Amino acid sequence: MCEYTAKDYKKGQPRWCPGCGDHFFLASLHKAMAEIGKAPWENAVISGIGCSSRLPYYMNTYAMQTIHGRAAAISTGAKVANPNLTVWQISGDGDGLAIGGNHFIHAVRRNIDLNMILLNNRIYGLTKGQYSPTSPRGFVSKSSPYGTVEDPFHPAELCFGARGRFFARAVATDAPGTVEVLKAAMAHKGASVCEILQNCVIFNNGTHDSVAKKEDRAKNAIYLKHGEPMLFGENNEYGLMQEGFGLKVVKLGENGITEKDILIHDAHCMDNTLQLKLALMEGPDFPIALGVIRDVEAPTYDCLLYTSPSPRD
């Protein structure tokens, strides 16, 4: 078997702004592909329109930048036409969840074997700073000078609502964490949704500051691993317990609480109730969940299409 390095997947000179989160993600994608070990020509990277959607230009794979919001549709066609191809769909929060929102939920619902990467910086960057479907209520932008009056989408809710079987989250500045979820997405057979939290240094700088730096992630984020207790903090001194139908943060050692009392993460549970609660956690009361939150098996559209009986049989 031929061994590949990140360099084998690189192409061209990225033209994003210095410090843009896209640089971090691109490097992680190159590294993940090398570790996965599939040849460049066994991969296709397909995007829509936006800053992050320039990514195919920097991939030494089959690559295509398509039209606004249609990355999922084109990716579906590529995967159905060639099931042996590994397809990476790249979308920003505006491209993927506004004009491309319907394509997004139906690709997830159909469980097409796509690696669906959502680069979420909570802003329209290419068009110079309008609020996006993931911008928080009250967000001030060029298109909302007095603050938005809308509640944002939570990508996890859309994925779970479309009966998604895989959802993971990483921070672009955390290369090991990003590579880990990309490899897990590749290993999963079906629609794999990965939300990547990243910064836009020009129009929404600092939007994910609470988890952007390693020293802050220890206290503001929790890395979920299947089969392991849900612990976080600089010394894993905090954990998650169930309280009624919800969750609560506890400190080990207080009120007799030990590690045995902490919930164990089950990414493979078919019932997504607890997984969704984890995915929706936000600061300051809860840590932001990172890692593979849901990963369950189900037949894929592209497989069933070729194995189901047809009227001609």
Describe every region a protein language model picked out.
Residues G12, A39-N43, A81-V87, R109-N115, ...:
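Short coil/turn connectors at secondary-structure junctions
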Residues R165-R217:
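ATP/pyrophosphate-binding catalytic subdomain of soluble kinases
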Residues I49-C51, N121-I123, D174, L197-I202, ...:
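Glycine-rich beta-alpha junction loops
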Residues Y306-D313:
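Conserved small/polar residues in nucleotide/adenosyl-binding loops
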Residues S132-A185:
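Conserved thiamine diphosphate
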Residues I196-A289:
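Internal helical hairpin/lid segments
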Residues M1-G125, V179:
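Thiamine diphosphate
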